[in-house]
């Protein structure tokens, strides 16, 4: 996912193609949205301590969805690569064109059938076909047992959710809570990305620091992750890397996210399974010049209003990428590296944390996963970019929190302090990224560890 965006006016996301859009539940009492559907369909699960262990996908053969019973998920160790299936009886009246598919031919002919019926726009139909082929090729690269079955299982659910959104566009609230029932969008996203991750060549840096975070969250503190941003799969990769060691963090991160991942029909079902604070992407702020000022004001309201409310609540963990978008490779060397941070955006976030009235902690986080779902080489204005997908190793790493007062003690002005703190966080992210790059792309594995970045491997591989 890219990082991200801020709409404070709900009407900014209304679709003009459907008179009865589905609406996300919002924790804000001021939200102007009123769900037109049964509240049981969209009711989010309130997540809190004790830590929730989450789960394996549903039994695909029976077409059932995993749901929460007594606030406990099935053991993470039972999870597989097949995506969560829609529960029986959900989405009354929704076509079963894709969910009933039993072969690749059924899926692809279903796209053509809905296109001819006028229920699936041509550009979306073409994008779905392209996505299928790319996803299939990537999963087959893994040489996993039953890879073709995994592709069919995951893609029929993905197409089913995408087609449902085409017919009944879901509208995100400025603050969106992950939808876990009656369809578990969180596990759907996890298990869709899972077979794309080469766990044998994936690494976590300083896993003990994530344990420190969990203890701080249990005490009611707030945690902010200042991160680079690589792909739309970032949230799933973070959660997969931590799902066996730090499940509470995996499930409860709130991502500051851009408007593109909540408007593209092929992205929206995955976004519905994440906790999101929605803003307008900095890199697309001027795509339509006459809307630029409105977008800036909306972002300010979202970040200073809703973000402040979230932080004052305590026990929240928030992820934000101060670069304002995804990393891109150097046009000359073709090497990937974290995009520079915007010092003002980062300073605004720090001030919100400081003024929230509870103990706050700011950590630098590095992500390396661009091979799985690389963005276009150039920033594009149009919604609906091509989906390049591959099977590859990934990595995340976190460093100990960086204290503003310690970093800026010798600074002579607020502007100098702002720049120094931003640079300190960025330098830490870059240092960690280099270690991850050496481990994954340099082939050094665990030997890439340094005195400041201790690498381990996800327990999915070790088990």
Swiss-Prot record:
It is an enzyme of class 2 (transferase). Residues 18-37, 65-95 are annotated as: Disordered. One of its GO terms (molecular function) is glycerol-3-phosphate O-acyltransferase activity. GO terms for cellular component: chloroplast stroma. It is found in: Plastid, Chloroplast stroma. InterPro entries: G3P_O-acylTrfase_chlp, G3P_O-acylTrfase_N, GPAT_N_sf, Plipid/glycerol_acylTrfase. Pathway: Phospholipid metabolism; CDP-diacylglycerol biosynthesis; CDP-diacylglycerol from sn-glycerol 3-phosphate: step 1/3. A motif (HXXXXD motif) lies at residues 229-234. Keywords: Acyltransferase, Chloroplast, Lipid biosynthesis, Lipid metabolism, Phospholipid biosynthesis, Phospholipid metabolism, Plastid, Transferase, Transit peptide. It catalyses: sn-glycerol 3-phosphate + an acyl-CoA = a 1-acyl-sn-glycero-3-phosphate + CoA. SMART domains: PlsC (SM00563). Disulfide bonds: none annotated. One of its GO terms (biological process) is phosphatidylglycerol biosynthetic process. Residues 1-91 form a transit peptide. Pfam families: Acyltransferase, GPAT_N. Its EC number is 2.3.1.15. Residues 24-37, 74-90 have a biased composition (Low complexity). The HXXXXD motif is essential for acyltransferase activity and may constitute the binding site for the phosphate moiety of the glycerol-3-phosphate. Esterifies acyl-group from acyl-ACP to the sn-1 position of glycerol-3-phosphate. The enzyme from chilling-resistant plants discriminates against non-fluid palmitic acid and selects oleic acid whereas the enzyme from sensitive plants accepts both fatty acids. Belongs to the GPAT/DAPAT family. This is Glycerol-3-phosphate acyltransferase, chloroplastic.
